[in-house]
Amino acid sequence: MILTSNVKLMPGSKVEAVIQISKEFVKAKYNEILKDYSSRLKVKGFRTGRVPFSIIEGKYSDNIRALAIENLIHKSLEEFFESAIYKPLSYAVPKILDEKLEINFDKDFEFTFVYESYPEFEISDISNFKVEIPEVVISDSDIEDELKLLQFENSIIVEDNGSVKVGSIVRVDFVELDDSLNEILATKRQDFVLTVGESDDYYGFGYDIIGMKKDEEKIVEKNYGSDYKFSELANTSKRLKIGVKDIKRRDIPELDDAFAKDVKDSLNTLEDLRDYVRENMLRVVQEKTNSLKLSKLLSGIAEKVNIDVPSSMFEAELKNVINEFSHQNKINITQLQNSSTGLEGVNDVFKENVLNKLKSKLVFQKMVDNDSSEVTELDLENELIKQAQNLKMAPQDVKKFYKERNLFGLLKDEIKRQKVKEKILQDLEEIKLEKVSFRDFVNYKTGE
């Protein structure tokens, strides 16, 4: 169909392409549409399918030509992109540059369009690349902290017949009172639940209810300083009526051999549990170290390589990040986009961080594309077995899941990405930095 096509790269990873279609093909396509019109058109004095072409062209020539042009562009773009050197972004729509396209049967049909493509760049040798990684120290206190977390996770909530204390889980009603001690109904809240000393309640009355018992009511005077966490309450005074409706406490299990057995059936003693916790912590450190090493490598490469990120690619990534932020923080995306943190209001530092992370992703994808290794049937089988073990399912059921949803292609891509990642980490040299605690290291942001 396409007679010739010429392309040239432009700034912003845009590609300008000129497509030429032979006049013979154009005429054939025009006649095809004309025949279709003739077969369906009803004109007084003629039977359907017997209307002379000259009459149809005299009345519908502009429509037929417009339809022919639309068809030619659509089909030629499909053919062009099937073998295009510069692959288009799936979410970017090609833009026709010609203001007015016309068919001239004496000339080949030609049109020019621009589309955004995957960025073109090369990665130099990384064999001498080094990354700096902190040395992680797992202390006895770190292990004890993890044991406390396990105790907390395995605790149960029970009724407390005593008074409110730090750590109590309390259900309260509260309302603001005016100077005449009348309730300000707009501020009334019922069945509000907080953990005393832990929850961040709006009025900050958690410590004021310590000592209260179930069904007890109390009026509390609150004075808020200029630096109060909620600015609308800063430099104000409030009078609150608070009623305690329910008091519960967290029943923490004893740290003993029986608890170890409850955590994992194969553990018999508390010392076994400590060893188990240490092993898990070492695994977390290794996983985090690998993430940090890869993140530093990719960002380091991205800084040295000129990656011309297309605007539509960046906008799509920015929207994904904002959507993820909205989901994690339970913020309605419409409200978020209408606020100062919407796409137009996102600050430059945030955008720069998103852009840098996007470049790191592009660098890694380029490394995957450049890797010549293939995913074998054995690799695929091993991954299915691994997933089956993790999900406690039969391997054939996991295989059926991927087959029914036609997801084997995606699974193979993910396996290759993992193989490339392992190869990179195996060859990557690291320089140990200062020692850091386990908790500080786990809370460290990798930039991924």
From Swiss-Prot:
It comes from the Bacteria. Transmembrane segments: none annotated. Keywords: Cell cycle, Cell division, Chaperone, Cytoplasm, Isomerase, Rotamase. Gene3D superfamilies: 3.10.50.40, Trigger factor ribosome-binding domain (3.30.70.1050), Trigger factor, C-terminal domain (1.10.3120.10). Its main location: cytoplasm. One of its GO terms (molecular function) is peptidyl-prolyl cis-trans isomerase activity. Its EC number is 5.2.1.8. GO terms for cellular component: cytoplasm. It catalyses: [protein]-peptidylproline (omega=180) = [protein]-peptidylproline (omega=0). It is found in: Cytoplasm. Residues 167-253 form the PPIase FKBP-type domain. Consists of 3 domains; the N-terminus binds the ribosome, the middle domain has PPIase activity, while the C-terminus has intrinsic chaperone activity on its own. Belongs to the FKBP-type PPIase family. Tig subfamily. Involved in protein export. Acts as a chaperone by maintaining the newly synthesized protein in an open conformation. Functions as a peptidyl-prolyl cis-trans isomerase. This is Trigger factor.
